[in-house]
Amino acid sequence: MSGRPIAVIAGGRTPERDVSLRGGHRVMTALNGLGHDAWLLDPADVKLVESLDARPADLCWLALHGKEGEDGTVQRLLDLLGLRYTGTPAFDCELAFDKVLAKDVLRRAGVPTPDWVVIEGSALRDLGAGVALPRALEWIGLRCIVKPSRSGSALGVSAVERETELAGAVMGALSFSGAAIVERMIRGTEVAAGFVGAALEALPLVEIVPKDGVYDYSARYTAGATEYFVPARLDAGVASTVRDAARAGTKYSVAPAVYRAL
C-alpha cells in the first residue's frame, strides 16, 4: 500500500476531541513515515464531505472518538460516499456503542455480563422516576458502577459504594447520554481482549491496573496513572475463558470489550 493517499479523520466536537486529535496526529505521522500521503481532517474545522471530494483518498483512517466517530455515524456517511475506512462496519459500531443494546445482546447470547438496570433521563424528567432510584440498588446491590449508555473513554463513569452517591452518579452519567446504566460492580483483574483480521487472531491480553482503582478518563489518558501488563498475569485457563468470551462478543457485533477475570 506504498504511497497511498490516506485521510486521517480525527477531532470532532465531542468531549474526547483532544484525545482523538492526539491519536490522529500520531497516525498521520506514522503513515507519512511509511511513505504514504496522509493528511488530517477535523470535522470541527472543515466540511468533511467537501474536503473528501476536493482531495480524494484511497482510505479514510478513522481516529474519531465517541459520538459520530464510534457510533456508526461517520461510517454510514463514508459508506454513502463509497469510501473505504478502517475499523468496524456501521451497524456493528452502532450496536457496540450503545451499552444497553450491547449488554442485552450479550446476555441473550449467553455471554457473561454484570447485572444492570437502565435509568432513562426522560423518566427522571417527565415521570418522576427520581424517587425510585434507590430501588436500582435492590436489584444490583449497593456497590455498583454508573455509566452513560452511549459515550466513550469512560466519561461520566462513577463507582458508587453508598446509597447517597447514586443520584449524583446518575446525573453525571446523564450529562453525557440520554440514559444511564447502573451495573453491578465486579471485583477482579481487568483485562482488554483484542483480535485482528477476519480470522480473529487473538492478540495478547492486556491487564489494566489503574492506581486509583477505577479505569476512568483520567486513568486512561494521564501518563503514569495506570499500569499495563502484556500479557496479562492470568493462568492459562482463565486467559482462555476471557478470550472465548471476547471472541463470542465479536460474533454478536459488540466487541471490542474489556473484561474482568474473577
Task: Identify the meaning behind each predicted range.
Residues 1-104, 108, 120-134:
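ATP-binding N-terminal substructure of ATP-dependent carboxylate-amine bond-forming enzymes
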Residues 131-132, 136, 252-260:
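Peripheral (often C-terminal) accessory segments that flank ATP-dependent C-N-forming ligase machineries
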Residues 106-107, 136-155, 178-187, 191:
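ATP-grasp fold ATP-binding core
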Residues 105-113, 172:
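Basic phosphate/pyrophosphate-binding loop/patch that engages nucleotide-derived ligands
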